[in-house]
């Protein structure tokens, strides 16, 4: 029985995700697999490539033939070079940066809040309101002067 290492497709339309499987060469693409040894998500940035190196080495040693896409993945992870005895067994796999945990984000926010100066709870009045207050003050002053002028005129 000829055994191949190939990809089976999973996922939604336009969001392909693959599993790296060991299967009989005569089975269809998504057919029955002997063993699943990894996964490949090409749409993520950087692409997620997770292959069980020990199982891949075993299946390559017993004669399983990788398809062209799987061979390219094995070269990226360094498993193909290890099997062939070539230099560069560390591979060229890029790893996604780890996201900070919620606890780390919370601690950072607390530290930032402690370092900031305390702000006033009351916001200053807008400039338009200040101009309106000045206009009202002038009107009240003018109104106060008018009765005083009337009183002086009446006294004379």
UniProtKB/Swiss-Prot annotation:
Q: Where is this region: Disordered?
A: 114-156
Keyword Ligase in record: no
Coiled-coil-forming residues are none
What Gene3D superfamilies does this protein's entry cite? 3.30.1320.10
Extent of Basic and acidic residues compositional bias: 130-139
Quote the biased-composition stretches of kind Low complexity, using this chain's numbering.
143-156
PANTHER family from the UniProt entry: 30S RIBOSOMAL PROTEIN S16, SMALL RIBOSOMAL SUBUNIT PROTEIN BS16M
Similarity section: Belongs to the bacterial ribosomal protein bS16 family.
| Protein name stated in the entry | Small ribosomal subunit protein bS16
Native source species: Rhodococcus erythropolis (strain PR4 / NBRC 100887)
What gene does the UniProt entry assign to this protein?
Answer: rpsP
């Amino acid at each position: 029985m000829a055994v191949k290492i190939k990809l089976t497709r999973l996922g939604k339309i336009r969001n392909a995700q693959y599993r790296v499987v060991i299967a009989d060469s005569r089975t269809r693409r998504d057919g029955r697999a002997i063993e699943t040894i990894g996964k490949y998500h090409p749409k993520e940035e950087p692409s997620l490539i997770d292959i069980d190196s020990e199982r891949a080495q075993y299946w390559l040693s017993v004669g399983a033939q990788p398809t062209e896409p799987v061979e390219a993945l094995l070269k990226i992870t360094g498993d193909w070079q290890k099997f062939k005895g070539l230099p560069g067994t560390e591979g060229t796999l890029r790893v996604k940066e780890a996201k900070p945990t919620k606890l780390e984000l919370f601690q950072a926010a607390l530290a930032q809040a402690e370092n900031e100066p305390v702000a006033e709870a009351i916001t200053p009045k807008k400039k338009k309101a200040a101009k309106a207050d000045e206009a009202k003050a002038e009107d009240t002053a003018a109104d106060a002067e008018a009765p005083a002028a009337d009183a002086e005129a009446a006294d004379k």
